Amino acid sequence: MRVLVINSGSSSIKYQLIEMDGEKVLCKGIAERIGIEGSRLVHRVNDEKYVIERELPDHEEALKLILNTLVDEKLGVIKDLKEIDAVGHRVVHGGERFKESVLVDEEVLKAIEEVSPLAPLHNPANLMGIKAAMKLLPGVPNVVVFDTAFHQTIPQKAYLYAIPYEYYEKHRIRRYGFHGTSHRYVSKRAAEILGKKLEELKIITCHIGNGASVAAVKYGKCVDTSMGFTPLEGLVMGTRSGDLDPAIPFFIMEKEGISPQEMYDILNKKSGVYGLSKGFSSDMRDIEEAALKGDEWCKLILDIYHYRIAKYIGAYAAAMNGVDAIVFTAGVGENSPITREDVCSYLEFLGVKLDKQKNEETIRGKEGIISTLDSRVKVLVVPTNEELMIARDTKEIVEKIGR
C-alpha cells in the first residue's frame, strides 16, 4: 500500500509518499508560500533536491503541482496517480469528539469545521488540504489524524481549569494538548527500544522544538500534558511564553494601551526565547552558540528554558507516582546534548544518570538510550516521525474497510 501523507498549513503543504511495505519514504517535499509571491515546490527523492518555481494561488493548485510531480517522468516516483492507495492528513484540533484517527466523510468534515474556532490558524488550512485531495484524487480514501486525539485519555482532574464551569459547558474550554501524534510515536518507539511493553511503562515524553510540550504517558495512555486549551501553555518556547500569571496580559494591555488581539500576538509570536533575547533569535541553536561564547544573558535564557522543562518532568513523575523512562524528541530534543544534560542534572533525585559520551553522540537523527547502565530511570533520544504514524493509522483504517 502507498500512502500520501499531507500536512496542510496556512501557506504551505508538506507531503511524503510512503510505501507501507517496509515503510520506505519514496519522496517528500513542501509547497511553500501558497497565495504569496515567490511560491515554489521543493521536492526531494533520496538525496536529490529539486526546486520548481511556480505561482500557487491556492491549496488546490499546490496539491495539483505535487501530484503532477509525483508522476513526472524525471522527478516522479510513481507512473500513475492510481498507485496512491490512500491519503493521510494531519489535523491539529479534533476537540472532544475525536479520540482516534478516522476515515473522512461529510460528517467528519463538518465536525472539523465546527471545532475550527479552537484552532483558527490551523484547522481551516487542514480542511483546505483535505478538500483538495478529495477533489483531485476521487475515490481514494482519506484519513484524518488529530494532534489532540492522543491526549483525550487525560482525566477530568487534569483537563478542567478552575474557572466558572459554565465556560466549559458553553465553549468547551479545557486542556486539549497538542503534538499528540509525536508523543504517541516516541512513547511507542521508546518501549520497543527498551524491549518492554508500553502498557507496563511510565514514560515522560519531551517534544522540544520551536513549539514544545511534555506528556505523561502511563501504561500507554496520556494522563497529562503541558500544552492546554491552546499551544500557548506550558514550556518556554521559540516565540511563545508558556506558563505565566493570567493577570500579566491584562496589566500589559492597560499599561501599553494594546488590544486583546495584539496581546495574543505578543504572547504567541514575540515572547518565549525570542522575547527574552530582546529579539535576537527564536532559535535555540543561536542562543546556545552565544552562551558558549560567553554571553551571560544567553546563558540565563538557557537556564530559564531548561528549568521549565525539568519542572514539568518532576511534576509528571509525581502525577504518575514514578517514571521508568524520559524521552527527548523534536528539533532541540534530538539535537541538543546541552539541553538534555542540563535538564537531567535536575533529575538526579529520581535516579537519572546520563552517559556523557552517548548523550553527545546521539544527534542528527540517531536514536538510543543515553543514560548509564545503572541509571534507575532510562533516558532516550527518539527522532519523531509524525508522518509515519499518520501513514500507519491510514493503512490500518483503510484495510479495516477493505479498500
Curated annotation (Swiss-Prot):
NCBIfam families: ackA. Pathway: Metabolic intermediate biosynthesis; acetyl-CoA biosynthesis; acetyl-CoA from acetate: step 1/2. Mg(2+) binds at N7, E386. Homodimer. This is Acetate kinase. The active site is at D147. It catalyses: acetate + ATP = acetyl phosphate + ADP. The record marks H179, R240 as: Transition state stabilizer. One of its GO terms (cellular component) is cytoplasm. It holds the Pfam family Acetate_kinase. Catalyzes the formation of acetyl phosphate from acetate and ATP. Can also catalyze the reverse reaction.
